[in-house]
Amino acid sequence: MIKSKMISFYIAVMMIWTCTVKAQDDNKSLIHKIGFDVRPSYVAPTSKFLKDDGYGNGLTLRKAASFHLKYGFQQNPNSKEGQLYPHTYQGIGISYNTFGNRQEVGNPWAAYVFQSSRIAKISSRLSFDYEWNFGASFGWHPYDENNNYRNKIIGSKINAYINLGFFLNAKLSRYCNLLVGADLTHYSNGNTHLPNAGLNTIGGRIGLVYTLNPIEESHHEI
């Protein structure tokens, strides 16, 4: 009788322990997201090279565009971190950038880390959010006193990439969100190579974020 009760007790303890471990593991599961952005922009005329109307071969440097592919992860809403930062996610991204003047400037790629979160809730399906990007851009055609002497804004093939955006985040479904807003971008090398006037853009952005494994917050009754 006592032995039978002890066995039942141990079985109950093991079941509780197993459920607890499973719940803890479930709470550690991350939410994974894939995003795609298109960002048309205007190039700020901050130097003579950008202000001139003549660009040698009829090329202009007024408009720019970038195309972004991103992977992000978010904390489980049932974890401690997820409850502290319920709308924050971060990750890595790559982008292809064009300025309409490949000959003198190039069409660089960028690789970066990013973070996004909510600023204000507007409704149950709409919020006002921000996102920052920080990384490096590659593939520029830098200044060369013989072959690319007009380009005095970019002095190196690799430059820092910095971006800050604000946008409306609309929840289309459990899996998909639409992002529409505006952003600012800066490219430069921090004076590691001269000349380094840098390049700045301001523009719009539209994108989609797809959540691969949405996890709902658990509401426990007391």
Describe these PLM feature segments.
Residues 1-36, 126-128, 170, 174-176, ...:
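Bacterial Sec-dependent N-terminal signal peptides
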Residues 24-74, 213, 222:
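Short glycine/proline- and aromatic-enriched beta-strand/turn motifs that initiate or cap beta-hairpins
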Residues 30-32, 61-67, 105-111, 126, ...:
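Residues that define the transmembrane beta-barrel architecture of outer-membrane proteins
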Residues 34-38, 90-92, 130-134, 166, ...:
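Membrane-embedded beta-strand positions of outer-membrane beta-barrel proteins
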Residues 38-44, 73-75, 94-100, 134-142, ...:
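Transmembrane beta-strands of outer-membrane beta-barrel pores
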Residues 44, 78-80, 170, 174-178, ...:
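Repeated loop/turn-to-beta-strand initiation elements of outer-membrane beta-barrel proteins
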Residues 53-57, 99-102, 148-154, 189-196:
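Extracellular loop and loop/strand-boundary signature of outer-membrane beta-barrel proteins
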Residues 85-138:
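Gram-negative (and chloroplast) outer-membrane scaffold detector with strong preference
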